[in-house]
């Protein structure tokens, strides 16, 4: 569930290893976090960023992106605008046919959800970012970038949407990928060799430092990338 807590510890302490206990998600206008009390959001443009729907009930996953925030809770999926309406396609058209949603990931004006039926995406359709490939086989993770999205399935990493910087062109060298993270114009994955990144390198965001030691998690931002390794360095 990528919350940084060992799965065996979570099981021993009565927590669900498939649901994140603590997490932080930063979008263009706001940041949201989950803690023991629920969801907390803050931002730079007043109530639009910090207001959380009162209907949320035990949220276990949250994602911010563009001008929207979405959360998964005991009742399913809830999305709301956080920039005054510039990206309303996500909050106004979220699907109602989800089956046990497990993960939500927001991009720039689009969103994707992983549920028991596979992956559903909606919102802006530019460059095919919301068109999920029929070829996906048993997907286990989805990550939305600004203009593209990627998923992890039985075949490895699959990406779709805008490929102007090569961010959806998955390297053939990837081996047994365990995580994928989509940024603005680049993508990174965690595999047997460590962290592998592709796409735009305009600010060095795909140049992986040689000092990484046994990385366990990677996160792609707009023009940067961060990783967690066994030294605790990000």
Regions found by a protein language model. Name each.
Residues 1, 8-23, 53, 95, ...:
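Proline-centered structural pivot motif
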Residues 1, 223-234:
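Low-complexity/repetitive intrinsically disordered segments
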Residues 22-31:
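Beta-strand-rich domains and repeat architectures in extracellular enzymes and scaffolds
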Residues 30, 58, 68, 99-100, ...:
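Asparagine/serine/threonine-enriched low-complexity, disordered tracts
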Residues 30-33, 41, 68-71, 79, ...:
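Conserved core positions of repeat-based scaffolds
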Residues 50-52, 90-94, 128-132, 166-170, ...:
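A short beta-strand motif characteristic of beta-propeller blades
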């Amino acid at each position: 569930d990528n919350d940084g807590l060992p799965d065996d510890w979570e099981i021993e302490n009565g927590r669900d290893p498939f649901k994140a206990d603590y997490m932080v998600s930063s979008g263009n206008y706001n940041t949201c976090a989950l803690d023991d009390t629920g969801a907390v959001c803050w931002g730079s443009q007043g109530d639009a960023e910090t207001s959380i729907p009162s209907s949320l009930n035990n949220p276990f996953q949250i994602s911010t992106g563009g001008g929207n925030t979405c959360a998964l809770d005991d009742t399913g999926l809830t999305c709301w605008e956080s920039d005054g309406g510039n990206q309303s396609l996500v909050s106004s058209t979220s699907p109602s046919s989800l089956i046990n949603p497990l993960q939500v990931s927001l991009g720039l004006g689009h969103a994707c959800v992983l549920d028991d039926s596979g992956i559903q995406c909606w919102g802006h359709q530019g460059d095919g970012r919301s068109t999920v490939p029929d070829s996906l086989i048993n997907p286990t993770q989805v990550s939305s970038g600004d203009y593209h999205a990627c998923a992890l399935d039985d075949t490895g990493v699959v990406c779709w949407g805008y490929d102007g910087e090569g961010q959806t062109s998955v390297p053939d060298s990837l081996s047994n990928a365990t995580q994928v993270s989509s940024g603005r114009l680049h993508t990174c994955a965690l595999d047997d060799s460590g962290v592998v990144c592709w796409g735009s390198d305009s600010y060095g965001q795909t140049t992986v430092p040689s000092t990484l030691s046994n990385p366990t998690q990677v996160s792609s931002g707009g023009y940067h990338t961060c990783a967690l390794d066994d030294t605790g360095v990000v």
